[in-house]
Amino acid sequence: MSNLPFTVAALYCFAPLPQYESLREPLAKLCCSNGIKGTLLLAAEGINGTVAGTPQAIEKLVQHITAIPGLADPELKYSHATEMPFHRMKVRLKREIVTMGVDGIDPLKSVGTYIAPQDWNALIADENTVVVDTRNDYEYAIGTFEGALDPQTKTFREFPEWVEQNRDKLEGKKIAMFCTGGIRCEKATAFVKGLGFDDVFHLKGGILKYLEEVPREDSMWNGECFVFDERVAVGHGLAESDVELCRACRRPISPEDKLSQFFEEGVSCAGCYDERTPEDRARYAERQKQVKLAEMRGAHKHIGS
């Protein structure tokens, strides 16, 4: 049991929710009345999200969600934080709970074989296995599994095209896919199996479950795991890391990255300096000045973002 004050719950569940719109208001009210913050996505295909609150509040929310028909057994991972990692609570209605943009993909009908964290090393060490990181380029940049291919995608929508263009790398191989918490692999493996590949596997519970359960000394993970909240990234044991976000482009940056001549807090980093005009950087600099003034007044540090 962690002594940290905030519990972070990452969850998803694919299940038919024909009346998903009606779930929004009760969820939003429960979260707001219990001080829970984060994001929950609802769609006809299920629920997905990450939220944080006191342990008691998160327990109440999970009880509410699992009482909904079809959502009794979500994929659920807990971690802990020293500070509230979200600024507000959002419950959104979506077309997909994870956006791939390919019609007809249904993980309830066809999906890859789940591999437990304890069995993952043996699979990816097999010379006949090709390991595919289904996440985006900025996530891959700060951490991945040994030998994993980087599709160099900016969004998950680009992943199907990468698969189509790289079929030769997958032919005749065991295909082992992974992502942060497992949800992207539900659709990624369903898509790949739909193309006719048979030996398709994915890491159950994703990187987060692996980092939680596999000891550092046995780990084949290198680096940190990007998470979509103010913690930015976590390491083995789901400990918070020293990775931060560039507030101009939202890329993760390490302490070493902050030594770059192109880094200016809230204004630019080496990754985005050439992507912005001098006018952009001047605008960001003014915004950063206002953020600092707000912090000095004790206001929320996200003002102006």
Swiss-Prot record:
It catalyses: uridine(34) in tRNA + AH2 + O2 = 5-hydroxyuridine(34) in tRNA + A + H2O. Belongs to the TrhO family. Residues 125-219 form the Rhodanese domain. HAMAP family: TrhO. GO terms for molecular function: oxidoreductase activity, acting on paired donors, with incorporation or reduction of molecular oxygen. Its EC number is 1.14.-.-. It is an enzyme of class 1 (oxidoreductase). The gene is trhO. Catalyzes oxygen-dependent 5-hydroxyuridine (ho5U) modification at position 34 in tRNAs. Signal peptide: none annotated. The active site is at C179 (cysteine persulfide intermediate). InterPro entries: Multihaem_cyt_sf, Rhodanese-like_dom, Rhodanese-like_dom_sf, TrhO, TRHO_N. It comes from Brucella anthropi (strain ATCC 49188 / DSM 6882 / CCUG 24695 / JCM 21032 / LMG 3331 / NBRC 15819 / NCTC 12168 / Alc 37). This is tRNA uridine(34) hydroxylase.
